[in-house]
UniProtKB/Swiss-Prot annotation:
Pfam families: Methyltransf_4
PROSITE patterns in UniProt: SAM_MT_TRMB
Entry EC no(s): 2.1.1.33
Pathway terms, separated by semicolons: tRNA modification; N(7)-methylguanine-tRNA biosynthesis
Protein name: tRNA (guanine-N(7)-)-methyltransferase
Catalytic-site annotation from UniProt: D179
Catalytic function, reaction form: guanosine(46) in tRNA + S-adenosyl-L-methionine = N(7)-methylguanosine(46) in tRNA + S-adenosyl-L-homocysteine
GO molecular function, one term: tRNA (guanine(46)-N7)-methyltransferase activity
Function: Catalyzes the formation of N(7)-methylguanine at position 46 (m7G46) in tRNA.
UniProtKB keywords: Methyltransferase, S-adenosyl-L-methionine, Transferase, tRNA processing
UniProt binding sites for substrate: K183, D215, T252, K253, F254, E255
Gene designation: trmB
NCBIfam families the UniProt entry points to: tRNA (guanosine(46)-N7)-methyltransferase TrmB (TIGR00091)
Any one Gene Ontology cellular component term annotated for this protein: tRNA methyltransferase complex
């Protein structure tokens, strides 16, 4: 594990854009207790939908009936989350049932590591939420070709989904390599913020954990600052520390290539008290 110094002095200015200077009073996230009625917080999107190529396998998985059981809602366009208010119920008729440990991955990208984790823990149920159709399709295709029965995929905004779920519902929430929103004027879009973590922790079970990883140094320090100051979460590496990559989080090709070039990757695991 590693420890960071004060966030305002820890980041080499050479790694920042003109807009991405060290955090100042206007950029630091408010750490005051959030109101109980967090369901009514105005949401600023943490993602930007991009047009990307969809290969034939991904398109097949989004349209062919043999993959339909992986897709919880409409996988084209803006995902309609109406009625999705219990992730455990999605597995009621599957081998693991609804009482198995439950992991929610937010923004699984193309799904490679998500599928690898689900295959490695067949007794755990995995739900992935994503907004990009090519990634949703590829993930469903890989799940189908491996005949996995512990995966469900949702198209839509993760924050909106979390607001609809019961309290103390999920055992593990993971957020790997989220968009760092590098420009200072976009910091409000960063997923890890006091407002959004109030929604995330509400859905976590007591004793459950939030695991995040980033390869963007400034965002890493931002996250540890926010999360260490958030009541109800405990840094499993100790306050101010990052943890080594746990064995259960697969290393992606992109991550391995970055490490070979000397880029850093920072993991954080927080337990809900």
């Amino acid at each position: 594990m590693s420890q960071h110094p004060d966030i305002n002095s820890s980041i080499d200015a050479n790694h920042l854009t003109d807009d991405q200077t060290s955090l100042d009073a206007n950029a630091v996230i408010d750490k005051e207790a959030m109101p109980d009625d967090s369901k009514h917080i105005r949401i600023v999107n943490t993602f930007m939908k991009r047009r990307t190529h969809m290969n034939k396998n991904a398109e097949l998985a989004l349209t062919a009936p043999e993959f339909a059981h992986y897709l919880v809602n409409n996988s084209f366009g803006d995902g309609n989350l109406d009625g999705i208010d219990d992730l455990r119920a999605l597995f009621a008729d599957l081998p693991n049932g609804s009482d198995a440990p439950l992991t929610l991955e937010i923004g699984f990208g193309l799904g490679d590591s998500f599928i690898e984790m689900a295959a490695a823990e067949p007794s755990r149920n995995f739900v992935g939420v994503e907004v990009h159709e090519p990634g949703i399709g590829k993930c469903a295709y890989m799940a189908g070709t491996q005949n996995l029965s512990n995966i469900k995929i949702i198209n839509g905004d993760a924050i909106q989904l979390l607001k609809q779920l019961p309290e103390n519902h999920i055992d593990r929430i993971q957020l790997y390599f989220p968009d760092p929103w590098q420009k200072k004027r976009h910091y409000k879009r960063r997923f890890v913020s006091a407002e959004r973590m109030a929604i995330v922790t509400r859905s976590l079970k007591q004793g459950g954990w939030f695991h995040t990883a980033t390869d963007w140094e400034h965002y890493a320090f931002w996250m540890v600052e926010v999360l260490d100051g958030f009541a109800g979460l405990s840094n499993q590496a100790g306050a101010g520390n990052f943890t080594d990559r746990p064995d259960f989080r697969p290393m992606t090709k992109f991550e391995r290539r970055g490490l070979e070039r000397g880029h850093g990757v920072w993991d954080l695991i927080y337990l809900k008290d």
